[in-house]
Amino acid sequence: MNFSITPIGYLETPFEAVNNMPIQPSVVASSEGKAVLYHEFAAGLKDLDGFSHIILLFLLHKIEGYQLEVVPFMDDVPHGIFATRSPKRPNRIGMSIVRLERIEDNIIYFKGVDMLNGSPLLDIKPYYSYFDNREDVRNGWLEGKVLPPERLKSDNRFNNK
């Protein structure tokens, strides 16, 4: 089955290239970005301003192809793509939880940028701690992996070849 998804807008961020960009929003919690919704979707923003955090789903538009096994940024051995947050995914969908700063008309201002400028925005969901926070979590191969912020940036391992 094939299907298509229509973007609801796009992201404006300071990052133009995959190399050296943050790999998670928490790495650059103070970095600022904008989610610009197309005007026909702006009414859907009603009441979103009551949330401190939102989940952005977007297309990893500068990534081509995919790999079912990758050496992720936080390890030096291969793992299955679905056990990582690496960008070389079959459907190239990115997800970030960001801090909502304010909404003006059809523009959401947020902090915690880990996506590329121009990324097509696919969906927005409110982060709701009652639903989204979990206890008794297992972290798989990531258990105990804590890297200093300067190491939490991408390199060239997922560049298009």
Regions found by a protein language model. Name each.
Residues 1-95, 102-161:
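Cys-His-centered catalytic/binding microenvironment captured across papain-like cysteine peptidases
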